[in-house]
Amino acid sequence: MSAQDFLVELGTEELPPKALTSLGEAFLAGIEKGLQAAGLNYTGKQVYAAPRRLAVLIRQLDVQQPDRSINIDGPPLQAAFNAEGEPTQAALGFAKKCGVELAEIDQSGPKLRFSQHIPGKATTDLLPTIVEDSLNDLPIPKRMRWAASREEFVRPTQWLVMLLGDQVVDCTILSQKAGRESRGHRFHHPETVVITTPANYVEDLRKAHVLADFAERRELISKRTAELAMQQEGTAIVPPALLDEVTALVEWPVPLVCSFEERFLEVPQEALITTMQDNQKYFCLLDSEGKLLPRFITVANIESRDPKQIVQGNEKVVRPRLTDAEFFFKQDKKQPLETFNERLKNVVFQAQLGTVYDKAERVSKLAAFVAPLIGGDAQRAGRAGLLSKCDLATEMVGEFPEMQGVAGYYYALNDGEPEDVALALNEQYMPRGAGAELPQTLTGAAVAIADKLDTLVGIFGIGMLPTGSKDPYALRRAALGVLRILIEKQLDLDLTGAVEFAVKQFGAKVKAPGLADQVLEFIFDRLRARYEDEGIDVATYLSVRALQPGSALDFDQRVQAVQAFRKLPEAEALAAVNKRVSNLLSKAEGAIAEQVEPKYFDNANEFSLYSAIQQADQAVQPMAAARQYSESLARLAALRDPVDAFFEAVMVNAEDAKVRANRYALLSRLRGLFLGVADISLLG
């Protein structure tokens, strides 16, 4: 079967830049779906997306749909005809369903069968519907109409190219009649561009100053920006999302270096970077020490004969933005940061839990409680907690919400607060996402933990638990943040005490009974997914969870020890033994004695196991005290041989009650040694 390249390009007014790549990918996916449904084969595919066009190239597409045969079985012959040989309703209904007379139905087999040969259609007849369906299915939240047309699309359409080989696919879609004429760059080549063949699409447009390939434009911008930054003895800040957005804004990218007055560098650089990136789509430059340079890179959509005009225009546009940031910074510094707390008395945190001012006071007290437990300073943590929300009421954060925490840091330093107190105002929000930076100071860690625990306890306390995908207060992220800080910073905090302290602070605002346990369970449940992501089996997590450690660091140390233990040759057998022992002990009548009485031993293997347990107990006690859990389990692995010998030679449920009870006590001692680390009976 012969095959040819197929190209479809829909020209539009400027498409939403943040949605450009997703629209292109969805367009391709829709066309592929239609081709597959039609049984049309092809060898390759490519999507192109630029500000004024979406295009798909399908390589070596079948020009003819293959013929198809369909066979539909109906009712059995016995049910299709009565004793007189007349057709029943079942037979007549089947024929009607197939759209034919009963005489056209095959009656030679055990069932009625309808067979039909369907000749394939020409691909040119199928493509218009496939393309139209794909465009209709694009993820467009809000469609628009234009002029007198009743058609709807994300932006008004301007032209349509549809070629199969060198032939135009005759159709009209979204008010545009298909042809082979595209459009070039709006200024460099406003004339139409004739697309000779689908394979020449990219090069035909390149001659018209349009780079249709999104990836090519992105790479060009990235490479040229890096080169220009190097020429300025700096490094460009190029967030992937911003690079994608800029790529979606230009058809013929030309990066240019611009500058601004050095006086603006007195403003926190985070504010300057935020406004230049978010509002102007500029790439900022940093020096070798990470300080902002008074220069930036803009990406023009034109190769100007006088690029200085473009540079001056961008410098003129950015100046008012930077002036605003400068004004807010100076205004906020006219009063101490702490005074902004008064404004927070009128800002509601949550209707049932009070104001942001109330939250800051709770965070202050909880941070002061947590700090000494992790090696920090209670007074400085309390101070940082008190100031933690002040910058939310400042002009700077009002204009640039992304500056919360960062603005507080600069204002605290301006007021002469200690460095760690100032840093904590920003570190309280860490980690800001999965894998993001953690607090570097103990004061910051204490405030971050306190802030997150306060939110968890408060929201749980009024019954607003996260459900499914709904988590408006980001409680899952808060819990994971607490765990990451404690585990990755190696901070040994008993969360039980901290959560109970947080509960008491809310008083009658929350339903206290069982609240602490509920919050702790939620927090430690987050570890399950964390360990699964690290490739740690869920059974390992459950073996430690059964002991309910209150410290996240201690929990993690136990998990790592169990994971190492499972690699030992003795692990599987000892896990099975622990499970057997657990089952035996659960059936014991009455309390199990704490002391083992050797006088009731009547088998040498009992003495051997008892001696091995005694020696192991003495060896692992100092290990347990030092939380050397891996070493402890490695030592306990040596119990395998005496344990195996015991169960081979000894009947635990002896007839003599005292002997039986003594054996239960011996096994309880054995199990207790392992429970010092984890319940390894759950590993089986």
UniProtKB/Swiss-Prot annotation:
It holds the Pfam family tRNA_synt_2f. It is found in: Cytoplasm. Signal peptide: none annotated. One of its GO terms (cellular component) is cytosol. InterPro entries: DALR_anticod-bd (IPR008909), Gly-tRNA-synth_bsu (IPR015944), Gly-tRNA-synth_heterodimer (IPR006194). Its EC number is 6.1.1.14. GO terms for molecular function: arginine-tRNA ligase activity; ATP binding; glycine-tRNA ligase activity. It comes from the Bacteria. Keywords: Aminoacyl-tRNA synthetase, ATP-binding, Cytoplasm, Ligase, Nucleotide-binding, Protein biosynthesis. It catalyses: tRNA(Gly) + glycine + ATP = glycyl-tRNA(Gly) + AMP + diphosphate. Its main location: cytoplasm. Belongs to the class-II aminoacyl-tRNA synthetase family. Tetramer of two alpha and two beta subunits. This is Glycine--tRNA ligase beta subunit.
